[in-house]
Amino acid sequence: MPAVKIGIIGAGSAVFSLRLVSDLCKTPGLSGSTVTLMDIDEERLDAVLTIAKKYVEEVGADLKFEKTTSVDEAIADADFVINTAMVGGHTYLEKVRRISEKYGYYRGIDAQEFNMVSDYYTFSNYNQLKYFVDIARKIERLSPKAWYSAAANPVFEGTTLVTRTVPIKAVGFCHGHYGVMEIIEKLGLERKQVDWQVAGVNHGIWLNRFRYNGEDAYPLLPRWISEKSKDWKPENPFNDQLSPAAIDMYKFYGVMPIGDTVRNASWRYHRDLETKKRWYGEPWGGADSEIGWKWYQDTLGKVTDITKKVAKFIKENPALKLSDLGSVLGKDLSEKQFVLEVEKILDPEKKSGEQHISFHDALLNDNRSRFVINIPNKGIIQGIDDDVVVEVPAVVDRDGIHPEKIDPPLPERVVKYYLRPRIMRMEMALEAFLTGDIRIIKEVLYRDPRTKSDEQVEKVIEEILSLPENEEMRKNYLKK
């Protein structure tokens, strides 16, 4: 059983990092491994490290920890590098969004047809794209045999960029495919009897195969829609898998959009707050409305505060067990949710649902498993270029990644009317980044239904480029 080094970049993301640590503890084949936690926010990093060590101590696992603020130290001699970092954080994203809305671009210039997710910036996110390439080049130099796992958005643009420009082993991960499980549950099906397959691009995947006990299960959907969809209400802003938007997309494309694909719809569903509420449900209007996104940001802030609070309490009370947190934390909903998350990771029988550690285990220890991953197409999906990264199921073992045959193929409408337009915007974002041709970003906005004049385009781009953190971006785009 090989002990490995796993570097986690952006490890101050508490819940994500703790999920990975818990999965490592539940993976015997990776026992004895070293986890290097890297983040530029030392306070958050220390808090995560404290809780992670406490967890490992309680479950009796053999894991070693290192912490660092240096990307190089996280990467050096690593076998796997997981990147979840967002350059500039949500503060930068909101700066760009405010400037964009000042000039008439509701929810920001990066909110585009088929890319409405609020932290999935592609055109104003030069620093994030550059960070992806910088990390990949450091891996090439410091740990050329390591696998790079992309978890930070934009996964589609980022993983395509890295696989095209740096010769390392790279793969992207997302949670979106778990939307299939909600459909299975709502239809009252036994999960083990369902044969499903999804395919597309990150945040643009579709349920191409849906069979139950060997029979086509799609006929069950219209019945649910006619009998129960009228009673649907979202439990939180992200609960949209069976929303009116999802059902409307299904009726047009012929297959169900899965996970974040429901959010990444056309402007028909996103024109304004009232439109969003109609398609994604009251009271939030989905995760990407101004209300839904504030809910998400507030939740993130609370989780950060709770993480620090728990870490402080552990240091002051070393005899405390994580299983006792329920008696320590208050009755606030966010604290209750944090306790539930801890209870999940303490369950020795269940992994977190994050795919990274199981993927590594499959490669190292030949524990053959099925994943939904982001890899270069290379003929997997018909009608898409080979060097475009697609999100598809694959079996992974010691011999590598074995993509499944997409059967049945995606409907032509999905490929022609959804995937190709989304891919076009990805190509425009990457060409703009790589060439420094600002005209490409302008062209995107000239085509934008929110644009009323060329002057509007010039002003919004100029103000975004003038942000202090965008000095390098400005030099890149104004060098010609």
Curated annotation (Swiss-Prot):
CDD domains the record matches: GH4_alpha_glucosidase_galactosidase (cd05297)
Report the SS bond pairs: none
Which amino acids does the record list as binding Mn(2+)?
Answer: 174, 203
Q: Keywords, A to Z?
A: Carbohydrate metabolism, Glycosidase, Hydrolase, Manganese, Metal-binding, NAD
Reaction catalysed by this chain? Hydrolysis of terminal, non-reducing (1->4)-linked alpha-D-glucose residues with release of alpha-D-glucose
Region forming the signal peptide: none
The active site is formed by 175 (proton donor), 260 (proton acceptor)
Q: Which InterPro entries match?
A: Alpha-glycosidase, GH4_Enzyme_sf, Glyco_hydro_4, Glyco_hydro_4_C, Lactate_DH/Glyco_Ohase_4_C, NAD(P)-bd_dom_sf
The record's free-text note on cofactor binding: Binds 1 NAD(+) per subunit. Binds 1 Mn(2+) ion per subunit.
* Biological process (GO), any one: carbohydrate metabolic process
Q: Where does substrate bind?
A: 119, 153
Temperature remarks: Optimum temperature is 85 degrees Celsius. Retains 80% activity after incubation at 85 degrees Celsius for 3 hours.
Q: What is its EC number?
A: 3.2.1.20
A Pfam family the protein falls into: Glyco_hydro_4C
Q: How the protein assembles, per its UniProt entry?
A: Homodimer.
NCBIfam families per UniProt: alpha_gluc_AglA
Name of protein: Alpha-glucosidase
* The species this protein was found in: Thermotoga neapolitana
